[in-house]
């Protein structure tokens, strides 16, 4: 609805399943930060063809049922909640989490935590999370259709074609029928 920064300072990306006339998600992040993260890869001759967000709004049919992720460690941990209504990151502290805990879906939500955040997450949230390494979460993120490489970060036509082939290959390789071969 409103941007908290100047549009020229932000990189914007549209959700992958956007349809004309329908509500859609627009992701926003600091353009300078994103370009600085990409620059070393491109300087090393590794052009970036896809930029995947770590967390996205859920695409499930239940708009209320969230997924919770505890990140970080016991000294600096975060709780990330995602559902079809968006993504929210809060410090993993009792006061910050209290408003979410009153939600009826809280106890039924899928709950994951990085190994270093398990103890503090369990103590504050009041239930045991499933342990999930950050790398596991990143692999799951890479399997979504989201891509921030849009607009001024989109590559040439040849690179876009290669990207489409790569996307098709990734879908094929991650298809359930190929699981025994992996």
Locations of the language-model features?
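Hydrophobic/aromatic-enriched cytosolic interaction surfaces used to assemble or bind macromolecules
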Residues: 1-182
């Amino acid at each position: 609805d409103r941007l908290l920064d100047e549009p020229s300072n932000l990189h914007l990306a549209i959700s992958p399943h956007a349809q004309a006339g329908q509500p859609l998600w627009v992701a926003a992040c600091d353009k300078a930060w994103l370009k600085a993260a990409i620059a070393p890869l491109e300087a090393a001759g590794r052009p970036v063809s896809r930029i995947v967000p770590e967390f996205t709004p859920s695409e499930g049919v239940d708009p209320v049922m969230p997924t919770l992720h505890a990140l970080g460690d016991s000294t600096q941990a975060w709780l990330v909640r995602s559902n079809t209504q968006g993504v929210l990151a809060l410090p993993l502290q009792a006061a910050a989490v209290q408003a979410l805990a009153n939600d009826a879906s809280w106890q039924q939500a899928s709950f994951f935590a990085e190994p270093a955040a398990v103890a503090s997450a369990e103590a504050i949230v009041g239930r045991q999370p499933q342990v999930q390494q950050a790398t596991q979460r990143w692999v799951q993120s890479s399997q979504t259709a989201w891509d921030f490489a849009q607009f001024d970060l989109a590559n040439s036509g040849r690179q876009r074609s290669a990207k489409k082939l790569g996307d098709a290959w990734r879908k094929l390789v991650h298809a359930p029928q190929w699981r025994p071969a992996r």
